[in-house]
Amino acid sequence: MNQQIKYRNRYNSPKGITIVALVVTIVIMLILVGVTVTIAINGGLIGTAKDSKEETRYTQVLAEKEMWESEKRSTDRFGAKAETLEEFVERLKKEKILTEEEGKQILELGFVTIEKKDILLDGKRNVADASLWDYQLDTKTNFVTITRYLGTTDNLTELTIPNFLLIDGKEYRVTKIEGHDAWQAIANFNGNVIISKGITEIGKASFNGANKITGVEIPDSVTLISDYAFQYCRSLTKIRIPGSVKKIGNWWDNVNGQVFNGCSNLKEVIFEEGIEEISGRAFDSCSKVEEWNLPKSLKRIGQWAFSSIGVEEFNIPENVESIYASFLSSSNLVKVNVDSNNKYFTSVDGILFDKNITRLIKYPEKRGSSSYEVPNTVNTIDANAFISCKNLQTIVIADSVEKIGDSAFYGSKLKTINLGGGITNINNKPFYGALNLTNINVITENDKYESENGVLFNKGKTILIKCPPAIINGEVYEIPNTVVEIGPQSFYRSQIKNVIIPSSVKKIGSESFFQCYNLEELNLSEGLERIEWRALQQCNKIKTIVVPSSVTYIDKECFRSMGRINQNNDKKSWGLNS
């Protein structure tokens, strides 16, 4: 016959339970006399008791929960009848370990909330009728995700998102706001949104485009603000992000975060301690924020997280350990500072490097110098490292530098780049968007590359890698007769009018002359075999191209946006109709 084991009758429990009970009893006694005790459950740290009545009560709840679960496992094994959850809750309420409200939450939701003290203890219920909301009910957990507000916002100055929905007479806990553009229904709501405590996630694109809301109150129960959540909320002027939020966006290693992207009137962001990760483009175009006080807890900053902002100085706190290339751009930036206790990064004359000064990460856009020599400890220049530099005209790349990232000089006023001897693998990509370049020079000791009249070639000049866009303005450029291949994007956005291609050239690479808006004449010689993808796209001033009979391949996208092509059978002349 099954014997019911009373929860407090420790002596009738199996041996393992007696030991658990004894240990937990000692722990509780120590807590009650003021000793700090850390309790680990299932190998994980659950809570630390501090010198406060509320923390002691919280620890008691955890200890009682562990004992109850341990006894339940054992009694199930031996076929005995254990204390039910209802009996457990009722007993803890009588002993004033649990409040009435907390007991109700445990009975409704189980123990899933017990490790979230801010939800379990002294939480406030904001119950709303389900008729005002679109929602999704997870029947396994009984948790609700709110996806849309169905009511009217007329005459409202404040809208509260509830933490409980009344569905068919029963209350269900709301844990998440979700749904792409879920709040477009309040796009014209000119007021403050209050998210009730207990909601743990602000889902993807939840408030995207709700451009008239003036404020959002985020509770400290929220642990994740997902991608695009507040994108283009253009009336937001201030936001507080609680320390419970560990991640602002899901992706730090690409540009898909965009949590507050386009919040163009945002002036103040309060980051509380606890935040660890800021995703890609999280605060892109938040140009009115005058100071970014990042928390000490921050560990990772994503790609373009602070793109197109407006500050003169930017500070990296002490615990940041990962910074994605291209994390920062500001047209007013003069200086990047790094906390002296940071183990991973440093600043030299306002320029951001890794701690050992082997990686140049960020050169400020508005730094005053017209020339700069990269330190000889650096081996890598990050992508977009010199983006939009206004005053820099000449840069000397040290022999130690082996790699230059894509678009490293994009949008800058640079005229001259002097490459050292360490560069062993380079293409056109680092120079992409550097439209003011007139000269790319290579030190003669470089074994892989050389230059002639400011044009970059491989060693031996068989491949033309990059002709600087501003090297010749309105003149003719004749490619050396050693060249066999014109590399991809080699003349991209060049100002040149006429290019003469010798018979040695066999291949014109992808986008070689892409967007050469001034190019009027391109002379192709017999011997040319291939014209690749978009090679002449948007060269709108070219009227006629004479294609030699040696050509065996022309990509179908080659002449796009140049007018209709008349393809003669003999391929000798392709006339372009305006």
Give the residues covered by each predicted segment.
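Structural signature of tandem-repeat unit edges
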Residues: 137-144, 154-176, 187-201, 211-224, ...
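N-terminal leader/signal peptides at the extreme start of proteins
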Residues: 1-15
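N-terminal single-pass transmembrane signal-anchor helix
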Residues: 15-39
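Membrane-proximal N-terminal amphipathic helix
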Residues: 45-80
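Extracellular/periplasmic head regions of type IV pilus-like filament subunits
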Residues: 70-123
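Intrinsically disordered, low-complexity repeat and linker tracts
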Residues: 49-62, 123-133, 147
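Basic helix-extension-helix modules of the SAP/HeH family
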Residues: 36, 40, 44-48
